[in-house]
């Protein structure tokens, strides 16, 4: 299965989402390959840390650029899951990956700048479905505010905006801005692999995302 993590705005946590999905799927016992198709190479940097620390389970990682559709189809023949991290803004990598993906998870912040790209995403989805009719796309609310006085209002505003785009499914799972997501990177870990109680909220968020998109 090809899982594409992408959106048209920088900064919503695409790489963080891809990393934690890859780890979560590997911990379920799947053979997972990450595909880093973003020139910032955050996925690759994290993977290098993981190799240095010799963390198990192993996750394969490849880099790709340009038209990556054939690369992804070839990887899909070898691995249970291919998790793809792409650059945004209608990049060649994003567009060509969408043609062959099984699932797209589209991280978005609850900000005007992020939400202003939803119309573009909707048009992309319509075009992908002309060639890939079984493609599923989920909008994922990311980097939410954990402040109790803001949290519910922010989520309500996100859902209200998305209600204007019923063609796009919105995940119930929400990712919040939490320190464990950052702390796990230099150790080559996903938050599910962190020890201690401080990561419990982040772990629950990843588990909810996993169970919603990839129910056991």
Question: What are these regions, as identified by a protein language model?
Answer:
Residues 118-131:
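Conserved C-terminal guanine-recognition region of P-loop GTPase G domains, centered on the G4
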Residues 145, 158-191:
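Beta-strand-loop-alpha "switch" segments that mediate conformational coupling across diverse proteins
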Residues 17:
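Hydrophobic positions on the alpha1 helix immediately C-terminal to the Walker A/P-loop
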Residues 182-203, 207:
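Inter-lobe coupling/hinge region of RecA-like P-loop helicase motors
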Residues 93-112:
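Inter-motif core of Ras-like GTPase G domains
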Residues 2, 6-8, 12, 21-88, ...:
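P-loop/Walker-type NTP enzyme "switch/lid" segment
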Residues 34, 84, 106, 139-141:
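Structural beta-sheet core signal
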């Amino acid at each position: 299965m090809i899982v594409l993590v992408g959106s048209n705005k920088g900064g919503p946590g695409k790489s963080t989402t891809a990393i934690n999905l890859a780890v979560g799927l590997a911990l379920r016992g799947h053979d997972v390959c990450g595909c880093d198709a973003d020139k910032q190479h955050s996925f690759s940097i994290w993977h290098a840390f993981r190799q240095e620390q010799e963390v198990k389970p192993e996750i394969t990682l490849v880099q790709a650029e340009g038209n990556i559709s054939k690369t992804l189809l070839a990887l899909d023949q070898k691995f249970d899951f291919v998790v793809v991290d792409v650059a945004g803004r209608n990049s060649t990598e994003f567009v060509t990956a969408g043609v062959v993906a099984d699932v797209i998870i589209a991280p978005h912040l609850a900000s005007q700048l992020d939400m202003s790209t939803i119309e573009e995403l909707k048009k992309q989805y319509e075009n992908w479905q002309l060639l890939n009719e079984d493609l599923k796309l989920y909008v994922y609310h990311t980097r939410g505010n954990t402040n109790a006085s803001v949290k519910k209002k922010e989520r309500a505003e996100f859902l209200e905006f998305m209600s204007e785009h019923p063609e796009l499914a919105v995940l119930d799972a929400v990712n919040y801005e939490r320190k464990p997501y950052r702390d796990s990177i230099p150790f080559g870990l996903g938050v599910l692999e962190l020890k201690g109680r401080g990561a419990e909220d982040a772990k629950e968020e990843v588990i909810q995302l996993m169970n919603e998109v990839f129910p056991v």
